[in-house]
Amino acid sequence: MAQFGGQKNPPWATQFTATAVSQPAALGVQQPSLLGASPTIYTQQTALAAAGLTTQTPANYQLTQTAALQQQAAAAAAALQQQYSQPQQALYSVQQQLQQPQQTLLTQPAVALPTSLSLSTPQPTAQITVSYPTPRSSQQQTQPQKQRVFTGVVTKLHDTFGFVDEDVFFQLSAVKGKTPQVGDRVLVEATYNPNMPFKWNAQRIQTLPNQNQSQTQPLLKTPPAVLQPIAPQTTFGVQTQPQPQSLLQAQISAASITPLLQTQPQPLLQQPQQKAGLLQPPVRIVSQPQPARRLDPPSRFSGRNDRGDQVPNRKDDRSRERERERRRSRERSPQRKRSRERSPRRERERSPRRVRRVVPRYTVQFSKFSLDCPSCDMMELRRRYQNLYIPSDFFDAQFTWVDAFPLSRPFQLGNYCNFYVMHREVESLEKNMAILDPPDADHLYSAKVMLMASPSMEDLYHKSCALAEDPQELRDGFQHPARLVKFLVGMKGKDEAMAIGGHWSPSLDGPDPEKDPSVLIKTAIRCCKALTGIDLSVCTQWYRFAEIRYHRPEETHKGRTVPAHVETVVLFFPDVWHCLPTRSEWETLSRGYKQQLVEKLQGERKEADGEQDEEEKDDGEAKEISTPTHWSKLDPKTMKVNDLRKELESRALSSKGLKSQLIARLTKQLKVEEQKEEQKELEKSEKEEDEDDDRKSEDDKEEEERKRQEEIERQRRERRYILPDEPAIIVHPNWAAKSGKFDCSIMSLSVLLDYRLEDNKEHSFEVSLFAELFNEMLQRDFGVRIYKSLLSLPEKEDKKEKDKKSKKDERKDKKEERDDETDEPKPKRRKSGDDKDKKEDRDERKKEDKRKDDSKDDDETEEDNNQDEYDPMEAEEAEDEEDDRDEEEMTKRDDKRDINRYCKERPSKDKEKEKTQMITINRDLLMAFVYFDQSHCGYLLEKDLEEILYTLGLHLSRAQVKKLLNKVVLRESCFYRKLTDTSKDEENHEESESLQEDMLGNRLLLPTPTVKQESKDVEENVGLIVYNGAMVDVGSLLQKLEKSEKVRAEVEQKLQLLEEKTDEDEKTILNLENSNKSLSGELREVKKDLSQLQENLKISENMNLQFENQMNKTIRNLSTVMDEIHTVLKKDNVKNEDKDQKSKENGASV
């Protein structure tokens, strides 16, 4: 792939092929490769580096020497073992056991001791890295490397397969040992296969041990001694084999071991219950992987500036000395240790943190040569693009894009344009009359165009830059701008891309193309119209991007001899976005293609149904036929369509379809009738009925399947004629061109850059060369944008001086306040208060030192996780404050109250800072950085940014570049998010645009010939032309045209929004009207019910009155009847009493 500098291997594959750690000059030897020896040594070194044991203090110097002896002995044993075993088995599944008696170690001859530990100056942990042996194939640049061994992180894991670093595919069957989980670091052996869907496939995967261990678990369980046999390290899970004596004789000397024999070695890690001492292990023993940004990316070509890494840095030495002082002070003060353990704040900080996200791999790729080169020959092409096939006739190329897009007028992305390639079945609405190969075609000149399709500038920002205000889902799905910028190319065959164009014709295009530039433009318009149907005559600007020259030998073409000549191929880059149809034109085109589909369907329907006139005449005759003709008298293959339909209709079968379908249907029916007769002869009526039922079910199934297939075909054809919603330039490829193999395709810039040596066609070479030049043009433009932004930044020294002045003023004010306080009474209280303040100040300083020391390891990891919150300016100020620490401590004692107040207010300020919403204010600068930072790490290394500035063709000196980089670079990195993003509160602040006048670097300082100056003076007057007797300024007209185009695009966008809003309003109005109708209907029903209820109420009231009157009458009648009953009863009682008296009187008389 061209992006990887002529190598097919991605950057992660070559990332670990660096040389070993540099050694001091006193030793004169180099550390052997750890991975080449054994995975055991690799894991030991990794574990020690992660635990922080490689930081060599005077107290544990002998301890590290002991570990070095063990590592070198095991490495030598593993190297010998690799000579007698298979390579893969020796790399992963070797179980070695190194046991050597004490006498053997003492009687070895004296040789140099290879070790990775410095004997002069202790090195910090961050500088001890794992190096891998450079494969033999890397020494030969002509042979691409097919195999890599590296360490990576498992990013995806499924049931049977997974991915390492998002690129390397592996199956679980290739895993050796413990099955890895997502986020685990693994040792990978991968091979490259370009024919597979995933180019890199892992052959073996092995999980690196000692991951996710608890803080209290020691990394080494058994403390080894110097002279004792080296026991197998059970912690790492890999054993070693016995080592022969001859190998140790070649590596270990008695003289080098003698100093180590005088003292008894102590264990690497003490037990947890022991108190603090010189060999006390660090408090935070957490195995954390090194940040990905610490690893240098692979250069596109072999690096030549390695000496910069060997220069000692005085700042690093000062920070190392300060770290040593802090460590000694901690070891001397056990009380501080106890107070730190009892501090609740430290307990909160020791709580298990959240799972660390996978840091993206640092990937920065750019061309490592000057980008202002106007020409190139075969050797220069071969040097620049090692993967590019160069045709045999090529001898020169002119890069005219340098003049077409100078630094003062760069190319502007963001002009929305898209293409829509139509199916070969769909015909163009307008007839194409362009001629591709005229009879007088001359091969001296060829004109070809590269048509760009690009999203709008707003879409580019959101899809590629991951703006600060975008949601997290959109920021995670970013794409590189090279994937969003696409080109319309022709396809000859399967995978052969070609630029669209053809040869010059004197009769159609005009004579003398060398003097008249419009001749080749006419050639490009004609050939593009003939091949794609796109009319480029609407384009207003034609940029001459490149000229490629071939030396053609004498040949015979179409029966005539063509002498040897030079063929010049001119690649044009027109503003094709002006050919984009407007919204109204797009709607007209959409209706036209739909109408074309309707007409085609009607014509096919007429052809399928036959002549409708004959069908109408024969309708009556078909109805009269009631009995079908006997099957033995019919021959379906010789019958006409009308006869076939009559026979089918008489048999109650479908008569629709083509003639072949009718013949098949009738033939099948006749066979069924023949079978029926045979069955009737056998008198099997029951079976005949069953067969009839089966036949009907089969016919129904066939009819349903036929209808379903017809519906699918209809929908497929309709999709070919339906245009998308967004306007695009319609492409109708000329299917008859290039021997019927021509087609068109839309390919992104990254795909065009992914060429191979196998693409050995001349037209593919032209497309690949254009892609490289276009990519270099974008690199130059984005690099110049970064350069301008660095020029606009203020100098860092001015800011330091202002800060120092402000600090001095603050100190004077505070001293005056203290003098005022001394004049006040209450001396006893002030004295006691001063003593108390001094004690609190000492405690506060101790806590501050502990807090800084304990959070040292956390800062490095948090830098990767919180890169957006990293402030290079503030960190630089912190370094300056550390340099003046003695003076600062004096002022801190006097400013105790201010410090306490600051410590109380600091958490609230941090919370407010976290809550503040960031917003991107400089989107152009962010896109410029993102174009180089392909993995969105958020920073660029200093050496990469320096080389980018050198490639711009500004002829800058090293001092000038260093001065620019000092403004933004911190710890060898430039965190560009601090230059492009800010909080919403600071959004309205205007940027300081005090840009320097000299934006072209040192180009104006170079001597220029007088001829070029005269030509420039002549070209300045070319912009004025005489048209209809008036002088016309072409430049101003073009500017007005661009403005009008922008206004038109904005108006169309607003119109589209208004149409959408109108549609929504119509829908809401329709819904409101429907709801109004329903509510009015309900209202009428409610009124009707109300009137009915009122009538019922009146009726019930009348009935109530009637009932009351009737009851009153009844009551009166009852009262009269009761009175009469009472009177009658009284009369009866009187009569009974009279009778009783009479009877008594009669009895008495008797």
Curated annotation (Swiss-Prot):
Domain of life: Eukaryota
SUPFAM superfamilies for this protein: EF-hand, Nucleic acid-binding proteins, SAP domain
Covalent cross-link Glycyl lysine isopeptide (Lys-Gly) (interchain with G-Cter in SUMO2), where: K1012, K1067, K1135
PROSITE patterns reported for this sequence: SAP
Record has Transcription as a keyword: yes
Compositional bias annotation for Acidic residues: 610-621, 856-889
Any GO BP: positive regulation of cell migration
Sorted UniProt keywords: Activator, Apoptosis, Cell cycle, Coiled coil, Cytoplasm, Isopeptide bond, Phosphoprotein, Repressor, Transcription, Transcription regulation, Ubl conjugation
Region (Disordered): 124-146, 285-354, 600-638, 673-713, 796-915
Spans traversing the lipid bilayer: none
Protein name stated in the entry: Cell division cycle and apoptosis regulator protein 1
